[in-house]
């Protein structure tokens, strides 16, 4: 099967039809959710943080970051994907239409951390004569380093096409000032194998990635998600949703009462 970046540029490939799959296809949602939770786990943020989500797409990773107490800003090159994200009732943070290959357009030291799911492999896509992969990589990592606080961590899941492209990405990140390496989850499995570029922007703390890899017996992201849902009661979830809708200015949001979240008796 052809890789998406071989078919068309991202702003064209992720059109209304393709973007719609991210809100209707449960398999895509499940995979994206699992990778997003793993990226946030590797980010290892100390308390609520200000996070940039690069290539946020339909907002799945943005939403998961917010559900863990973080403030998340999303950026993506596809208008269709951002439209899907805007239609979501879950996302509170801002969304930005931007090509990461032209640089990360934020002030120095803005973000505590950065996540990215299935995005940075597009930087190697030379779909236009002006898009030189090495130049785009340089611009991306240099501006990303500047936009992060010192000691901040970036975790980017991606699909490397070749060992050469994988090394090219790692070398460019190091030249920009980052420390770190690549974490490979489930390295023995062809279907479950996932690559995460884990980077640290300076700071005094040493980044050790040797113990970060998951094998087949490792922690299951679905189990973590289930436990998290169990920790929030039905009443708490309903009140949380109501509060979100009020902040967005939605009309006719029911008032909270002692009956909120209670199961109704069967009708006669």
Swiss-Prot record:
First-listed, main subcellular location of the protein, grouped into a coarse class: cytoplasm
Any single GO CC term annotated in Swiss-Prot or TrEMBL for this entry: cytosol
Keyword S-adenosyl-L-methionine: yes
Enzyme Commission number(s): 2.1.1.-
GO terms classed as biological process: rRNA (guanine-N7)-methylation
Family membership noted in the UniProt record: Belongs to the class I-like SAM-binding methyltransferase superfamily. BUD23/WBSCR22 family.
Protein name: 18S rRNA (guanine-N(7))-methyltransferase bud23
Originating organism: Schizosaccharomyces pombe (strain 972 / ATCC 24843) (Fission yeast)
This protein's encoding gene: bud23
